[in-house]
């Protein structure tokens, strides 16, 4: 069987693989074959993912996630920023004038590791995002309330949401 490719920077690999080595290495511990194939990526350097639909180039950028970092991704003029409470200065230039931004908005009140709705809306406006989809929303962000009260260029996401983009 073919392993599922996963893309990890050095820091993520250092933390993840020792905990889940049985997923990456044919195992003495588990007796099962490995299911994941590590592909090492470097922050702020593009990498290409190939699939049945062709190739897509991704650029990983650094985000703040409380006292640790997380990685956001930009591809074409789209960014994905989950598990984020702030951005490192080096990452900011990748956020301007996006066509789409899929971005964290956990709840109404501030949280130590996830951005809250007001902050997310400020970023969307500041960076002049054309269309944003909120993700990682907690139960206190009511979907219908958000539909009625968000700016026209911002929508709450939902499970199985999909939309077409030109690549």
For every predicted segment, state its role.
Residues 3, 35, 76, 97-99, ...:
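Short, well-ordered alpha-helix to beta-strand connector turns
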